[in-house]
């Protein structure tokens, strides 16, 4: 009820803007039951009701039937008129509910700062000027078909006045309680002072005041309760007393339903939910097996995946432990054999070093019809590269390019070669090169 009364007062305040033809129409919105989701239509003002009344409007007829088609009425209920202007048509297209996000309405409500939008040349927009002004628990929009210069004073005036209109009246904030012998107090002149809701004085009460309590001639106490519980006013014959009922206000605060709770900072609440959703999306991206897309399903799948990783980790640790034990046993056996026969150990170590020293690794890959890639890894020593080139030449291969890389005492040579004849296999070429390299050492 308070919102409807405030909307009527806002329409009365905004109507002169439309009457003066400064703006073509205005729309009033209020925040819905969930302020962070949608806004609801409250009312509007249209300039279509102020066209020349001497113009005769005829109902259009449908061809062939002779039936008259009734024109629809404009949504502005201040002065009932039919849809006959662009402003009326634009109002008929507005929905009763509109989502806040994503859109310009949500930005204005969240930032609580007005926006003055001017459309310079786009044919998609019907209006050239559009103004969105945030007010208390609502939003005001003004539209014009032509371009309007920015008027900061008008915007501030609308914000201040409309916000005041939506605030509750002082008498809605008070609880009046008249204690015994109220009739005697009303018969004699008293002065009333109201704390927290303004001040007023009453002297020589009229017949209206007597009729107000005429229905309770034998009542010892009359209470007038309002929606909001605030300090109560006590009227006594001896003197005026203003007492604040703190206990009642605390009890009423405890009894407030949670459904009427409104967040003080919708922007921070929205950011918090976005962070939670982003974390959920990140968790869902990491877990490979997702059975359900709800929050409970994502968490349960993540727990199962972590348990699987722990089991796999334990298996790998056991396997690594077994490998280490085998290596330790082999080392211990070698040490025991070396202690038993040191001369044999010395001979075997020398032979192993010699084998490793003279080891040559060759890889051959076919890259084309006659093209081959040869990779040779050997010990870096004198005339090693020369022997490799000679072996390639003996195989009747043409060298296209050579890449030479050295690390400590190891050398890797990569050659791109081309054969002079067809039918050369990679395996045969590799064995031939390896044989030539070993015999030349």
From Swiss-Prot:
Gene3D superfamilies: Helix-loop-helix DNA-binding domain. It holds the Pfam family bHLH-MYC_N. It comes from the Eukaryota. Residues 260-309 form the bHLH domain. InterPro entries: bHLH_dom, HLH_DNA-bd_sf, MYC/MYB_N, TF_AMS/ICE1/BHLH6-like. GO terms for cellular component: nucleus. GO terms for molecular function: DNA binding; DNA-binding transcription factor activity; protein dimerization activity. GO terms for biological process: regulation of DNA-templated transcription. Expressed constitutively in roots, leaves, stems, and flowers. The keyword Cytoplasm does not apply. Keywords: DNA-binding, Nucleus, Transcription, Transcription regulation. It is found in: Nucleus. Homodimer. This is Transcription factor bHLH90. It comes from Arabidopsis thaliana (Mouse-ear cress). The lineage of its organism: Eukaryota, Viridiplantae, Streptophyta, Embryophyta, Tracheophyta. The gene is BHLH90.
